[in-house]
């Protein structure tokens, strides 16, 4: 499975000629990297790998993860199903989108002062024997993650940088996946919000105990699972 980070938390998963988008239709918001207009234009035009988009998923509706206008434009262009968690979304929901089996689990958002609460979910995504765990802005709750994982270990997992800051979350990373990626990292030159510096300091301090953890600081970044 090919995985491409196209924006702050925007992932494109490719398998068997199909593409699944997760949090990929955001716009620039504060210090967070938005999907470039030229990439969005390729999506609308159906240029590869966007010629067979089988689904568009969002973890929540905050603007660094979701743009309603871009979502409606892409839905009109390609007809792919769109899923955004709602207040009445079940605690656990299964979906089949092309070759991807998607397990959606409700999970509260990390508290952010001044930011409205939004229904939030994490995703366990399987295709062709590979498993991906996408956590976006899930609050720090290791036991809830363990309940969702239920002893499973992903081939790749994607985490907010705050998961580097606590001993219990660093331990979780080692359990949760073969390869762990810290994403949602700003690329503004001055790093006004300080998130990139904090992630880099954490890796400098704890990297020896996290051999299978990498920072995703380049857009786009391409990976294989």
Annotate each language-model stretch with its function.
Residues 21-23, 52-64, 68, 83-86, ...:
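Active-site neighborhood of phospho(di)ester-bond hydrolases with catalytic His/Asp-centered motifs
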Residues 31, 43-101:
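Active-site HxH/HxHxD metal-binding segment of metal-dependent hydrolases
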Residues 1-30, 34-42, 197-201, 205-225:
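Zn-dependent metallo-beta-lactamase
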Residues 89-99, 117, 148, 170-225:
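Binuclear metal-ion centers of metallo-dependent hydrolases, dominated by the metallo-beta-lactamase
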Residues 13-17, 97, 124-128:
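Active-site beta-strand termini and strand-to-loop segments that position acidic
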Residues 16-56, 69-73, 113, 139-152:
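Pre-active-site segment of Zn-dependent metallo-hydrolases
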